[in-house]
């Protein structure tokens, strides 16, 4: 029996080694030198791609002057290795890919990938003070996906929920809740993927800079049951139909909030609830707090333009009468989609004597800003 066990163990090790060899062959083409990409060293970043067949390889990254169309040419070296070295951009998380003979491809040597809607892009981490909370903390919270019934929309839907470190070990403790909403093209996975929400909250809580809190990240597309990656067909929806105008916002307040209060140990009152959202989610944030004043005492619309309207003052006065603790607006000065609209909201709040903060950052309508905003306003919640 001992001899048989030894043989089986040896066979298992052999299979493991073969699998590792297969992965090695896949990553490095099974030929030529082992290469590293990206390589961050001494203030420089080097990108490499083994593509001997290619006639032209370019690098595209969102740190470039034009993040949408900007490219830099890579040079072909010995063994068909294409390479480029650039000055490291400022500390942040960036995305990039290669363009090989006109076709966009990901870096096969970099398994750090994030999804932006239907696009999958490689991630480049540049360490530093600004990005330190985007890395893993020592104490980790938990991220789970939950399904809930939505009678108003007519089907079950999925959300992502973050619970802080220690939630499971402290069965009597109750926690405040941040409802964190994504933008257009996103879904319930956007804030944990591109937004690094779990890492940011883990770090802030571990450092004592933020209160331990639950974070709820729903799917803000009322025609979707869940992210498209699950392969669940979206429902047909006429966006011009008035019944859909505030369908998601109503579901958020009337269905999601009660579900969370029932399923989790929450501080189930306005002082224990915050709502924040980027772009489309910022619109959901303003709509939810105008239509349902007194549900959330911490309000943070991000990169969200609001239009002038004759009724805007009356709508905002409902929030003032209900009371609130924090109204925090974040926008980038280069955000052509939301900057002017944020100034409109700022002016109306000022004219109505409603205390608030207008936080204006650099850059435009980008995740670089939204991670910064979460890292900033999360420190102000529930205090």
List PLM regions with ranges.
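Bacterial Sec-dependent N-terminal signal peptides
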Residues: 1-23
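Non-catalytic cap/lid and distal C-terminal segments of serine-dependent acyl enzymes
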Residues: 21-28, 35-69, 75-383
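Short, intrinsically disordered low-complexity segments
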Residues: 2, 30-33
